[in-house]
Amino acid sequence: MRALVTGAAGFIGSTLVDRLLADGHSVVGLDNFATGRATNLEHLADNSAHVFVEADIVTADLHAILEQHRPEVVFHLAAQIDVRRSVADPQFDAAVNVIGTVRLAEAARQTGVRKIVHTSSGGSIYGTPPEYPTPETAPTDPASPYAAGKVAGEIYLNTFRHLYGLDCSHIAPANVYGPRQDPHGEAGVVAIFAQALLSGKPTRVFGDGTNTRDYVFVDDVVDAFVRVSADVGGGLRFNIGTGKETSDRQLHSAVAAAVGGPDDPEFHPPRLGDLKRSCLDIGLAERVLGWRPQIELADGVRRTVEYFRHKHTD
């Protein structure tokens, strides 16, 4: 298979590129380095099965890029991922996450792409749902422009599927963590805790520590992307998580144990817009894709901490 991965220099995207290459596929990676890092791909410099294109999905001539490389499947991970930035600047968020997605879909349908695998957001699109773990049948109720843009991307791609025959599926991950996650900013709390504790800096928990999330390891998420790239799950959204809730306080304890550091976070007022709970029902992915998470939280946290420990000592 010849695949194109947008957002290829990002945390999840670069891990997906590695997996596809390991499986024997050829990969074209595309990224504008807005949040992705060249260091995530530098180990592929001499890999003849990998080509990298520096481009922005909002401004690049995507038709020319896809015409040149002729991918069979496009994995669409490029996105504006900062929820708070989406609240402050919804127009920019929509330009990337909605218009960028439509531009990619238009180029894909014109150049013979078989399928787009789109990245949605299981951690945000359901808002405060009526049940936990939350299934795909729950109504979407975006609480941010970021979440609204992810839902809009799903709708547009499903419309392209019905109108033009461009197949698509949607991966809706819970809270993804693992090596290469960005430890800066406000997202990626496992990486943030790990980096701070390894550096001897204070850690912060927003609220009283009882907010919960469903933490899923990046390798498990990448496995779901690979599975759905086949001729399965057309037009469907697949929740990709663990079905287990972990509180902020429990997560801090797990990271502190892996680091061997103090389990004594500072507690700060809750942040506007933060959900109280999030946990995904993964039954559809189990039934249709044969997918289940393989990495338990303690093991995944340990692997993540070791990655940052190695970086910290370099």
Curated annotation (Swiss-Prot):
Keywords: Carbohydrate metabolism, Galactose metabolism, Isomerase, NAD
Active site (catalytic residues): 146 (proton acceptor)
Signal peptide: none
Enzyme class: isomerase
Function, as annotated: Involved in the metabolism of galactose. Catalyzes the conversion of UDP-galactose (UDP-Gal) to UDP-glucose (UDP-Glc) through a mechanism involving the transient reduction of NAD.
Positions with a binding annotation for substrate: 121, 146, 175, 189-190, 204-206, 213, 271-274
Gene Ontology annotations for the cellular component aspect, listed alphabetically: plasma membrane
EC number: 5.1.3.2
GO MF, one example: UDP-glucose 4-epimerase activity
SUPFAM superfamilies per record: NAD(P)-binding Rossmann-fold domains
Binding-site positions, NAD(+): 11-12, 31-36, 56-57, 77-81, 146, 150
Record-linked InterPro entries: Epimerase_deHydtase, NAD(P)-bd_dom_sf
Cofactor: NAD(+)
GO aspect biological process, one term: galactose metabolic process
Organism: Mycobacterium tuberculosis (strain ATCC 25618 / H37Rv)
Protein name, per record: UDP-glucose 4-epimerase
Catalyzed reactions: UDP-alpha-D-glucose = UDP-alpha-D-galactose
Subunit structure: Homodimer.
Pathway where it operates: Carbohydrate metabolism; galactose metabolism
Superkingdom field: Bacteria
Family affiliation: Belongs to the NAD(P)-dependent epimerase/dehydratase family.
